[in-house]
Design a protein with these regions (language model features):
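Intrinsically disordered, polybasic Lys/Arg-rich low-complexity tracts
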Residues: 5-37
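Generic secretory/membrane-interface signal
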Residues: 34, 38, 106, 114, ...
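A glycine/proline-hinged amphipathic helix-loop "lid/cap" segment
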Residues: 5, 40-182, 452-458
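Acidic, Ala/Val/Gly-enriched low-complexity intrinsically disordered segments
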Residues: 16-19, 27, 40, 45-47, ...
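Alpha/beta-hydrolase superfamily serine-hydrolase fold, recognizing
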Residues: 64, 71-88, 163-458
């Protein structure tokens, strides 16, 4: 996209979504069941399993990007996820049974029907379980983390054409009792030396920060999403298990995010990645951290931060940044928060709870490392892929930041999926959401492979 005009808004048409859904549904019907990864603190669970047909190939389009024909043999669904996915491929039936057949329309936008069905089912399940809210907008963090891990087991198909290795890397300030920051390294089979991906036979790398309001989320909750990103983008993905609030409030997560990014940049040979093509990416709170890292390492960076956030000299700026429905301002004063702050999974009440845990000192709300949208200067930051959802309280944050970057001359690709909600990237049980997630991963892969000097064709 040109850096001189407004960012291009990509709105999904019904016809395009239907076609994408058909492709994904066809692939899902051909998938089979396999065991789900066993949770472990180092991230080594499930490493190297299930090569599947098409493993060891460089991928299509000549740049290691996603070949849709590979999806059919390399997706595996846990049995429960298969059943739930089948159910939500028939949203009209689900909505009729729940007595909620009328479509949800807000400001000219119509909520995706499968998403609406999931939303209605979730409301009823919350009514049965009680939701665990303390009344302060946030439940018990430990309970919430376990719930998110359990949900992740049925939320996404598991890519089996990806090799996964867990390890600990050095941290600026290690959590008590820890030897560093846990990470998982994802590499699609065949991605590397001799794979035909160009870039001197070394793929780009994406440092990924999970979402969860800086309070929940970990390597387990986002394992399937990171597998998908590695498989589709043709990049090596390094997922970061940064410290969480309220045990470790701001700026602990920023410190860990920056330390992990610096480590990846400094270990390109060990990781067998292109040293000049390391990007950052994250969803929700992780998008906030990705934007913060891009700001802190931008060319000529002089970003006021909390005293604990330090940037070692010589850390290069990311090659690109991917921000998926990011939260970029702690003020919570946007129009989309007012309109969509209740009833669409992420609520204003829960957002306030996350903010209270992560940013207990209100003075920190205005810092660029906590609220990148409020940064005085953004020129020189990495080219950005900014993705928002139409029914998301954080939609305006992403669009405003895309506009701000564009005005500063930064290359931006902006996509708004008008019929989606916050968190769709982790809702692979919905065919439409999975198709759009693949599209986002492909877009990030294209950005990381841009100007590839040595493209090859299969």
């Amino acid at each position: 996209m040109s850096s001189t005009g407004p960012p291009a808004k990509v709105v999904r048409s019904t016809k395009a979504v239907t076609a994408a859904k058909a492709r994904t549904t066809k692939a899902t019907r051909r998938s089979t069941t396999s065991a789900t990864p066993t949770p472990d603190p180092t991230g080594e669970a499930g490493a190297g399993r299930g090569h599947g047909r098409g493993a060891g190939r460089g991928g299509g389009r000549g740049r290691g990007l996603y070949n849709r024909q590979m999806q059919r043999s390399n997706e595996r669904w846990p049995l429960a996820a298969s059943l739930v996915s089948w159910l939500f491929r028939h949203p009209e039936l689900v909505l009729a049974l729940l007595g909620k057949q009328a479509p949800i329309q807000v400001n000219g936008r119509v909520l995706n029907r499968s998403t609406q069905a999931l939303l209605e089912v979730s409301k009823r399940l919350e009514g049965v379980t009680g939701g665990g809210d303390t009344g302060e907008g946030l439940g018990d963090p430990l309970v919430m983390r376990k719930q998110l891990q359990r949900m992740a087991l049925i939320a996404m198909p598991i890519r089996t054409d990806v090799h996964v290795v867990g390890r600990l890397i050095p941290a600026t300030e290690s959590p008590e009792g820890s030897n560093g920051i846990p990470v998982r390294i994802y590499r699609r089979f065949g991605t590397g030396v001799g794979s035909g991906v160009g870039l001197g036979a070394r793929p780009p790398a994406i440092v990924y920060y999970h979402g969860g309001g800086w309070v929940t989320g970990d390597l387990i909750s986002h394992d399937a999403s990171c597998r998908l990103l590695a498989a589709v983008s043709g990049c090596v993905v390094v997922a970061v298990d940064y410290r969480l609030a309220p045990e470790d409030p701001f700026p602990a997560a920023v410190d860990d995010a920056l330390a992990a990014y610096a480590w990846v940049c400094g270990h390109a040979d060990e990781l067998r990645i292109a040293e000049d093509r390391v990007g950052v990416m994250g969803d929700s709170a992780g998008g906030n951290l990705a934007a913060a890292v891009a700001l802190l390492t931008r060319k000529g960076a002089s970003v006021p931060t909390a005293s604990a956030v330090t940037v070692a000299p010589g850390i290069p700026a990311p090659f690109a940044q991917g921000l998926l429905y990011p939260g970029l301002s702690a003020r919570f004063d946007s129009e989309s928060i007012r309109i969509f702050g209740e009833g669409f999974f992420l609520t204003l009440q829960s957002m306030k709870g996350f903010r209270r845990a992560y940013l207990p000192d209100q003075a920190d709300w205005e810092l660029a490392a906590a609220s990148p949208l409020l940064a005085d200067e953004v020129d020189g930051v990495a080219p950005a892929l900014v993705v928002t959802a139409g029914f998301d309280p954080l939609c305006d944050d992403g669009q405003a930041y895309a506009d701000k970057l564009t005005s500063a001359g930064v290359e931006v690709e902006y996509r708004c999926y008008d019929d989606q909600v916050h968190g769709f990237f982790n809702m692979g049980i919905l065919a439409d959401s999975l198709a759009l997630s693949i599209e986002v991963c492909d877009a990030m892969g294209r950005m990381m492979h841009r100007d590839d000097p040595t493209p090859t064709e299969e």
